[in-house]
Amino acid sequence: MATDLEFMEFVAEQIENAGIITFRKMFGEYALYSNGKVVALVCDNKLFVKPTIKGREFIGIITEGFAYPGAKPSFLIEEKLEDREWLSELIRITEKALPEPKPKKKRKKKN
C-alpha cells in the first residue's frame, strides 16, 4: 500500500520546526529530508527514521521496522507521531548525526 499524500503532509507539518523540511516521492513512497539530508522514509503510512546512536538514546525504548523488503532496520515511530515537539527534536538529532550528502557528480556531455 502506497503512502497517502495527506499522511506525508501531516508528518511534514509535525516536524516543520526541525529545519528545512522537504519530501520527495519515490516508488509510491516518500523520502523525508531535513536541511538536505534524508532523515526518514515514509512507507505504507508509517514513519521510519534513520537509526543513529543519539537518536536511540533520545527515544529510549525503540521499535525497529523495515520500510520495505530488503531495507535496513529503522526506528518505527508510531506512538509519538502526534507529539510535534518530541518528533521535531528526534529529526534534529538525526539530521545532526548523519553525514553530509555526497555531492552529485556532473554528467559528461555526449558529443
Whereabouts are the PLM-identified features?
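Charge-dense, helix-prone N-terminal extensions
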Residues: 1-111
